[in-house]
Regions:
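Glycine-biased, low-complexity coil/linker segments
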Residues: 17-20
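C-terminal motif of bacterial Sec signal peptides marking the signal peptidase cleavage site
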Residues: 44-45
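Tryptophan (W) side chains
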Residues: 22-24
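Long, low-complexity segments enriched in small/aliphatic residues
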Residues: 346, 351-390
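Gly/Pro-rich cap/lid or specificity-loop segments adjacent to the active site
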Residues: 49-324, 379-523
């Protein structure tokens, strides 16, 4: 038994070989909330950001368990100021989980995983972390739940709590009044939504680093987590050994604007791909026309449908309209194998059978139920992204996206009452770095963080390697040989020695050919 520790001896658990199930999915677990509504220290010669005051005491890890893991790990808590500019306002508690390295003498620079969303808890990535067997041979892996989600003083508002809602209430339609009500509920709890921003979490990461007395760390960010990782690199480059960005969100991206364009482009590309495929046309002869026919049929007030809730088996009814249909289709786009179900879903719906659509929607929603905090999602996007979208840009977006424009309009309306964050002048500008090696991973079929974002980000990172996986959607690191690629990079910190066979496999990968493997007979 390998034992080591801070406060007391720690037992290194056996690596978990179970299936991966987390928030945004690369192939399978798609995020229903992700990106739905979804400078100083630029260069080495610049002066790094000032160090925050170190924690008054070191972290004390104790044995613990997470619902997503069958093995025991270690957990700790760290109190940090709610508002570092006004420490008299009190503190909140961060939760840090550690999957220890399988060695008596781990390297002094652990790998920190930064989750997506915004709003996803890092603890939801525990199965992914446990599966990084090669990385854990030498290094601890740390999961820091961002303030406001998971076990880090989570934000709570009944208006956005979907745990007890019927399936008919879990779609996007009507989200704006719920978000506004959530804001009121947070204020009633004396919660300041602006305490829960990206840069506050960046400083929390630095506080954890100082508390653990780590000279440097390796960062992996997925989706929104890439924004956090890049901002940490911008402010603390001297403490970053390697940086891996997967599903890259370029600093210039405004979630409340760009996500809708990316989703619309991916939906159109999927429809065109289906129409060009003989096997797909056998399932649905004209998918674009089929979708438009359904949208016209479901124009408000829509259609009253009866169905059995796939979670409970209970009979329910739902007033389904065109916006709800489009909202329910969005999660299918995140991964090629689920996107390939679109023709079957459309064909069934044309025949007034909405069960496949509702079942898929519930599957994705259930996956994220305990992983995403919608209140934190809006606290960040409404304060940091929505204010950077001009009225003219909103109007242009709505006019250019006739299919999903109404959904975009709801996301804008949801943010109307939220306060605007005061952000530094370098916010939204490229992160410039000449020294830290950066690995950027993109899925060619990603509907929300397309490869163009990674290419844009890479332009100001001197030491970078950009890999685009041909047949993968959102998040590459969980697919095929990518965990071994990540392990090799973190071990060597050398972009020129990445395993060439794995790189070629990812770059030449093709999407699954599921058009010819229908879940139901062709019409």
């Amino acid at each position: 038994m390998i034992r080591r520790g801070l406060k007391s001896a720690r037992c290194a658990p056996s690596p978990s070989r179970g299936g991966l199930g987390w928030g945004w999915v690369s192939g399978h677990g798609v995020p229903l909330f992700f990106v739905l509504f979804v400078s100083a220290a630029f260069v080495v010669a610049c002066t790094p950001a000032p160090e925050p005051s170190p924690s008054s005491k070191a972290l004390s890890f104790e044995p613990c368990r997470l619902p997503s893991l069958s093995v025991e790990i270690q957990c700790a808590r760290l109190d940090v100021p709610k508002d570092r500019a006004h420490p008299e306002r009190g503190t909140l508690s961060l939760h840090i989980a550690r999957l220890p390295a399988n060695t008596r003498h781990p390297e002094a620079d652990p790998l920190i995983l930064l989750a997506g969303g915004p709003g996803q808890a890092a603890s939801a990535l525990a199965p992914f972390a446990a599966a990084l067997i090669e990385t854990r041979r030498q290094r601890d892996i740390l999961l820091i739940d961002p303030r406001g989600t998971g076990r880090s003083s989570p934000l709570r508002c009944d208006a956005l709590d979907e745990k007890n809602e019927a399936l008919s209430d879990t779609v996007l339609t009507g989200i704006a009044p719920k978000v506004r009500q959530c804001f009121d509920q947070l204020v009633e709890q004396s919660i300041h939504p602006l305490d829960y921003g990206t840069l506050a979490f960046v400083e929390d990461i630095e506080a954890v680093r100082q508390a653990l007395k780590l000279p440097r760390v390796n960062l992996w960010g997925g989706s929104y987590g890439t924004r956090v990782a890049l901002e940490y690199l911008r402010r603390y480059p001297q403490h970053v050994r390697t940086l891996t960005l997967d599903g890259v969100m370029a600093p210039s991206v405004r979630i409340t604007l760009n996500a809708w364009r990316s989703r619309d482009a991916r939906l159109n590309a999927l429809l065109q791909s289906c129409e060009a495929s003989e096997s797909c046309r056998a399932l649905q002869p004209s998918p674009s026309a089929a979708l438009d026919t359904l949208l016209a049929r479901l124009t408000a007030p829509g259609l009253r449908i009866a169905f059995n809730d796939p979670r409970t088996g209970n009979a329910e009814t739902l007033q389904l309209d065109s916006d709800m249909l489009l909202a329910a289709l969005q999660p299918l786009l995140y991964a090629p194998d689920t996107a390939a179900l679109l023709p079957q879903v459309l064909t069934a719906a044309l025949n007034d059978d909405f069960a496949p659509l509702l079942a898929l929607t519930q599957s994705f929603s259930s996956t994220l139920g305990g992983q995403m905090n919608p209140a934190l999602h809006y606290a960040i996007t409404c304060a940091e992204d929505a204010p950077r979208v001009s009225d003219e840009e909103r109007e242009t977006l709505l006019s250019e996206l006739p299919r999903i424009g109404a959904l975009a309009a709801q996301s804008f309306a949801a943010c109307e009452r939220w306060p605007v964050a005061t952000l530094p002048d370098d916010w939204g500008t490229p992160v410039v770095n000449d020294n830290v090696p950066v690995l950027l991973l993109s899925g060619a079929l990603d509907p929300v963080t397309p490869p163009t974002y990674a290419a844009e980000t890479a332009q100001t990172l001197t030491k970078h390697r950009l890999i685009t996986a041909g047949g993968i959607g959102h998040i590459v690191s969980t697919q095929a040989c990518a965990p071994q690629l990540l392990a090799a990079f973190v071990k060597s910190a050398n972009l020129s020695t990445l395993p060439t066979t794995c790189v070629a496999h990812l770059e030449n990968s093709a999407p699954p050919l599921l058009w010819s493997n229908p879940l139901m007979p062709a019409p």
